[in-house]
């Protein structure tokens, strides 16, 4: 098992949870129990332009927290190594629940409630279902990314296409070998 250092604390990596536009997220074990360690990467992304990814994550976390968006708590930041330690939210992602037919209707209802917080603040989040976990009856957004509102990328026009058995979701699953 690999060990990651964050501000002098050791975290033993259990597994890769996922790779996003901005980094790799690992399930890790620390003295406080299971956590997520996100390592910022600098790999190119053809459809998204970043400035300082770490500062963007921190700014977006503060913005979304102030709105009351349920997210994992930010536990530590190591600016030198570009790593974040986040609360681990256990359970299957919304995508995994869609694939097994176990996503309850309350998940989409809660997503629409989140939109009622985001849109007046002129913000969108990444609505893709891998970014959400329903835990303890609460829908958590496990990413920290937010962007200025644009109707073409809001939940109704973009995100909802991936929250049901749609041609877009089936194409994504096939492209990523998950069908």
What function would you assign to each model-found segment?
Residues 1-14:
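Juxta-kinase regulatory segment immediately upstream of eukaryotic protein kinase catalytic domains
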Residues 13-16, 21-54:
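ATP-binding glycine-rich loop module of kinase domains
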Residues 49-67:
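The N-lobe alphaC helix and its flanking beta3-alphaC-beta4 segment of protein kinase-like domains
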Residues 69-107:
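Conserved structural core of kinase catalytic domains
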Residues 106-114:
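Conserved alphaE helix
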Residues 107, 119-124, 134-179:
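C-lobe/activation-segment region of protein kinase-like
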Residues 127:
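Hydrophobic HxD+1 residue recognition
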Residues 130-131:
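Conserved protein-kinase catalytic-loop position immediately C-terminal to the HRD catalytic Asp
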């Amino acid at each position: 098992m690999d060990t990651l250092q964050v501000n002098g604390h050791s975290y033993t990596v259990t597994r890769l949870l996922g790779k996003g536009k901005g980094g790799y997220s690992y399930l890790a074990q620390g003295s406080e129990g299971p956590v997520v360690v996100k390592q910022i990467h600098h790999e190119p992304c053809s459809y998204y332009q970043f400035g300082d990814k770490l500062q963007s994550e921190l700014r977006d976390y503060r913005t979304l927290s102030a709105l009351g968006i349920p997210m994992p708590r930010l536990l530590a930041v190591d600016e030198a190594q570009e790593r974040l330690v986040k609360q681990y939210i256990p359970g299957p992602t919304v995508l995994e629940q869609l694939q097994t037919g176990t996503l309850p209707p309350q998940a989409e209802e809660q997503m629409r409630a989140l939109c009622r917080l985001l849109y007046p603040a002129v913000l969108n989040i990444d609505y893709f279902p891998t970014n959400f976990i329903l835990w303890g009856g609460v829908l958590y957004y496990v990413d920290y990314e937010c962007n200025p509102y644009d109707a073409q990328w809001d939940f109704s026009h973009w995100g909802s296409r991936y929250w049901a058995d749609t041609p877009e979701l089936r194409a994504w699953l096939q492209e990523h070998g998950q069908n």
